[in-house]
């Protein structure tokens, strides 16, 4: 089995890690960073830019830059660039492809298998969409694991004794809280809760809204209509939020943000930590609801928690830490890196699957209840939330009308009593039921949830033995043919990226060779053979012309044609120089002879 990597595919940043010689290492990207911004941009010529470079150009290219795509996973959302629409899976695949390529360059080998993390509260549709993104990027996703569980693995792998830990995971776009019991290599999730629409982006948005409203009051201009201005505000808000974790106030300075008849307008305001806390107080409180829910589901009180792990960059916000400190009456544990621990945990799970790490058992749970719609639009649960996975459960149902020959099984996920208020995972129909009075046929509905948290459902008529099943695989609205097309497209773009990189590198080499040749001519033209000088000048001109094309082979051929006469030219110059030196010093046939004065000391 080849190397299996662990990937934290985040809303704001992503991270990749691998087990190397018994230790997990976080793999730096091509730019040298340990995390990669989850940003994808499209250049004017259609080229794809991912990561730090994409984030840097976002201000000047906001309409062709995609951020926080994870928030749309498992939905019908589409990103339109030029005349082409992209699914969240395709955009996520571009981020995964960047991580994969950088890891391959770092490790010097192909990466084909991965463990990818998702928020614990991700639905089946969102989990399946994440698997699809992995496939499009050319990765076999061996396991999907929950982010808080991965963080617990990173924390607890080398810990002895039993502990009850709570993982508070506030990322860029999602919030999860999980309670685990760990000890003797067993990591058992007792309860999980969360909110898939709450994260650091929402804290940024509060600052943006505050800036926009103040500017509108002062100047009567609504900056929301200016995409470039909004991108500048987003970057400034994120920067201010980060700075306020370390200082009590920060300056937000955005010159030339807009203009009116009197000239350019600027933003230059001071944001204090107290004001930021006021703007975001309800967001902090919103994280405490799921925290209380998880404790209640696990049958625990705050004092029963031994350690609180903070995961995700947003947990650096002082108000968040204070809320946790106040609720649990203890300091949260700060011994793990909140940006990297999820990828590290995924790499540990990858090493477990590869057989490199022994005696580790991971028992995760399903975050939401699963069931079907029954008579009257009621949601009937078959598997309760926080059930350990993998698991299976069956229940007998019957027909609602006389002589009913088919039943539609509507599969749902959620906690609300009515079917319409929950997430629909899919529908399928069991046909061929013999006509009978209502209540007579017996239909067994069976749910199976695999280790990835992905659902398989079957319905069987116990009278005839007829069975129909569905694996909830197309909840992300991608057919197998679409996924295959996207995989091929991603491979084609990877090849185009490779060619583009090769072209740039060859162009740089050619440019360097021309510089070297021209410098040599400038320094030694008077001393050189005129024929050689003419050949070098001709070769330089031809190489310059070749550089105007995108033909790598032509550039290389012309570089070769320049290298030969340039080598002859420099060799002849060195030979001339050597001959001159020899003439000046003369030729000595008796080896090295030295003239020396000497003095005889007479001790007599």
From Swiss-Prot:
CDD domains: ASKHA_NBD_HSP70_DnaK-like
Record key words, sorted: ATP-binding, Chaperone, Nucleotide-binding, Phosphoprotein, Stress response
Keyword Repeat tagged: no
SUPFAM superfamilies membership: Actin-like ATPase domain, Heat shock protein 70kD (HSP70), C-terminal subdomain, Heat shock protein 70kD (HSP70), peptide-binding domain
Record's note on what induces expression: By stress conditions e.g. heat shock.
GO molecular function, one term: unfolded protein binding
Annotated Gene3D superfamilies: 1.20.1270.10, 3.30.420.40, Actin, Chain A, domain 4, Substrate Binding Domain Of DNAk, Chain A, domain 1
Region annotation Disordered: where it falls in the sequence: 578-604
Pfam families: HSP70
Modified residues (Phosphothreonine): 174
Bias type Low complexity, positions: 579-592
Function text: Acts as a chaperone.
Protein family per UniProt: Belongs to the heat shock protein 70 family.
Protein name: Chaperone protein DnaK
Gene name as annotated: dnaK
């Amino acid at each position: 089995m080849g190397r299996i990597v662990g990937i934290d595919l985040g809303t704001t940043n992503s991270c990749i890690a691998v087990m190397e010689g018994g230790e997990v290492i976080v793999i730096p990207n091509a730019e040298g960073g340990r995390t990669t911004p989850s940003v994808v941009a499209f250049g004017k010529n259609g080229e794809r830019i991912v990561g730090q470079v994409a984030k840097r150009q976002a201000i000047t290219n906001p309409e062709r830059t995609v951020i926080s795509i994870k928030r749309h996973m498992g939905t019908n959302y589409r990103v339109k660039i030029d005349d082409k629409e992209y699914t969240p899976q395709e955009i996520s695949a571009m981020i995964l492809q960047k991580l994969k390529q950088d890891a391959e360059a770092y490790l010097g080998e192909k990466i084909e298998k991965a463990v990818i993390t998702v928020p614990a509260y991700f639905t089946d549709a969102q989990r399946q969409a994440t698997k699809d993104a992995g496939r499009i990027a050319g990765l076999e996703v061996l396991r999907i694991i929950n982010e808080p569980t991965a963080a617990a693995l990173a924390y607890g792998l080398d810990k002895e004794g039993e502990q009850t830990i709570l993982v508070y995971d506030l990322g860029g776009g999602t919030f999860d809280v999980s309670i685990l019991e760990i000890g003797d290599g067993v990591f058992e999730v007792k309860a999980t809760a969360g909110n898939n629409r709450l994260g650091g982006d929402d804290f940024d948005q509060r600052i943006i809204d505050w800036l926009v409203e103040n500017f509108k009051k002062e100047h009567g201009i609504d900056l929301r209509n200016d995409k470039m201005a909004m991108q500048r505000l987003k970057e400034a808000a994120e920067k201010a939020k980060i700075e306020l974790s370390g200082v009590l106030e920060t300056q937000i300075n955005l010159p030339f943000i807009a203009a009116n008849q009197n000239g350019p307008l600027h933003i230059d305001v001071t944001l204090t930590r107290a004001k930021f806390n006021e703007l975001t107080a309800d967001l902090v409180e919103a994280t405490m609801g799921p925290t209380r829910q998880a404790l209640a589901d696990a049958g625990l009180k705050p004092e029963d928690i031994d350690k609180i792990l903070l995961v995700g960059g947003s947990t650096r916000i002082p108000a968040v830490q204070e809320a946790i400190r106040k609720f649990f009456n203890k300091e949260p544990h700060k011994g793990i890196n909140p940006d990297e621990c999820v990828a590290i945990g995924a790499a540990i799970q990858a090493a477990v699957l590869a057989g490199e790490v022994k005696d580790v058992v991971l028992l995760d749970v399903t975050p939401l209840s699963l069931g079907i719609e029954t008579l009257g639009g009621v949601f009937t649960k078959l598997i309760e939330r926080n059930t350990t996975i993998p698991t299976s459960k069956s229940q007998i149902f019957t027909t609602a009308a006389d002589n009913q020959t088919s039943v539609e099984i509507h599969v749902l996920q959620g906690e609300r009593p009515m079917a319409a208020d929950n997430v629909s995972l899919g529908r399928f129909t069991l046909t061929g039921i013999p006509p009978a009075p209502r209540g007579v046929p017996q239909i067994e509905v069976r749910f199976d949830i695999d280790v990835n948290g992905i659902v398989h459902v079957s319905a069987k008529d116990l009278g005839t033995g007829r069975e129909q099943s569905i694996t909830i695989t197309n909840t992300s609205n991608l057919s197998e043919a679409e996924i295959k097309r996207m995989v091929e497209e991603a491979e084609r773009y990877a090849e185009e990226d490779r060619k583009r990189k090769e072209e740039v590198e060859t162009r740089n080499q050619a440019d360097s060779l021309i510089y070297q040749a021209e410098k040599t001519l400038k320094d030694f033209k008077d001393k050189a053979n005129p024929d050689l000088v003419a050949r070098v000048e001709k070769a330089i001109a031809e190489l310059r012309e070749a550089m105007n094309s995108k033909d790598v082979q032509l550039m290389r051929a012309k570089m070769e044609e320049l290298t030969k006469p340039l080598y002859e030219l420099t060799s002849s110059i060195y030979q001339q120089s050597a001959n001159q030196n020899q003439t000046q010093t003369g030729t000595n046939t008796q080896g090295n002879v030295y003239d020396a004065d000497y003095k005889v000391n007479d001790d007599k």
